[in-house]
From Swiss-Prot:
Active-site residues (renumbered): H37 (proton acceptor), W177 (tryptophan radical intermediate)
InterPro entries from the UniProt entry: Ccp1-like (IPR044831), Haem_peroxidase (IPR002016), Haem_peroxidase_sf (IPR010255), Peroxidase_I (IPR002207), Peroxidases_AS (IPR019794)
Protein's name in the database: Putative cytochrome c peroxidase, mitochondrial
Keyword line: Heme, Iron, Metal-binding, Mitochondrion, Oxidoreductase, Peroxidase, Transit peptide
Cofactors: heme b
Compartments where located: Mitochondrion matrix; Mitochondrion intermembrane space
Length: 285
């Protein structure tokens, strides 16, 4: 394959999404989660964290409790990396999330290459920078404002919960947010608005919300979107207008995966801490 043929990489990613042995028959949602968590460590005040560097290759970040289960996503992408050794892990992880969203009937998300892979743990961000689903609106604002997002963007990014499910042995929570967790839509917002949600304590002591028939769940952080007037306004808008949600989600997810990437006037990412030795992407934990 020609070096720099990102369309070929896109096609290869799309080809591995269907997987009968994984949740709901698709690895798409966990690839979106990988792109999200690889980017969501950014701190605008210090310029640290973000998608550049692929720092989840290193034990310190890989072992952050918020990243439990993402070793699966990283391993799923190893055959792609082997087939296209010229692509950095930082680019591969973010591109995989973008492709997964599109393949699950979501919006097209702008994506640019150029991220680099850091050579060691020096620039691994501190643990604890990712959202905690057990918390409420104040926590969401603390986390997302740190990255540079506003209230509308917070709600739009929460819409990623249209995909995937929680696992008690990973996050402590259990279940899916929507009936079809491998199709991107605005169902998450409709359900927040229209279902009756009851706070329940799981057998592990973790609290989450269930709908009346206990088929679907919401995290306390999800439900806080209904309790905060500014957040609630955007939940209402996105529940009523799928096209508006798709438009806003595309923009904000593109912004998310660019966090930590320093680009020059030509749009190319500035080279920094390149891993020229192709270090082990999955350090022994």
């Amino acid at each position: 394959m020609a070096e720099g043929d990102y369309n070929a990489v896109r096609e290869a990613i799309a080809d591995i999404l269907d997987n009968d042995d994984y949740d709901d028959g698709s690895i798409g949602p966990v690839l979106v989660r990988l792109a999200w968590h690889a980017s969501g460590t950014y701190d605008k005040a210090t310029g640290t964290g973000g998608s550049n560097g692929a720092t989840m290759r290193y034990m310190k970040e890989a072992k952050d409790e918020a990243n439990n289960g993402l070793e699966n996503a990283r391993q799923f992408l190893e055959p792609i990396k082997a087939k296209f050794p010229w692509i950095t892990y930082a680019d591969l992880w973010t591109l995989a999330g973008v492709v997964a969203i599109e393949e699950m009937d979501g919006p097209k998300v702008p994506w640019k290459p150029g991220r680099q892979d850091y050579v060691d743990e020096t620039n691994v961000p501190p643990n604890g920078r990712l959202p905690d689903g057990a918390q409420g609106q104040d926590h969401l604002r603390d986390i997302f404002y740190r990255m540079g997002f506003n209230d509308q963007e917070i709600v739009a990014l929460c819409g990623a919960h249209n995909m995937g499910r929680c696992h008690m042995d990973r996050s402590g929570f259990e279940g899916a947010w929507v009936p079809n967790p491998i199709r991107f839509a605005n169902t998450y917002f409709k359900l927040l608005m229209n279902e009756e949600w009851k706070l329940t304590t799981l057998k592990n002591g973790v609290k989450q919300y269930f709908n009346e028939d206990e088929e679907l769940m919401m995290l306390p952080a999800d439900y806080s979107l209904m309790q905060d007037p500014e957040f609630h306004k955007w939940v209402e808008i996105y529940a009523a207008d799928k096209e508006k949600f798709f438009e806003d989600f595309s923009k904000v997810f593109a912004k998310l995966i660019e966090l930590g990437v320093r680009r020059g006037p030509d749009g190319k990412a500035k080279t920094n801490f390149i891993d020229r030795n192709n270090n082990d992407p999955n350090p022994r934990l």
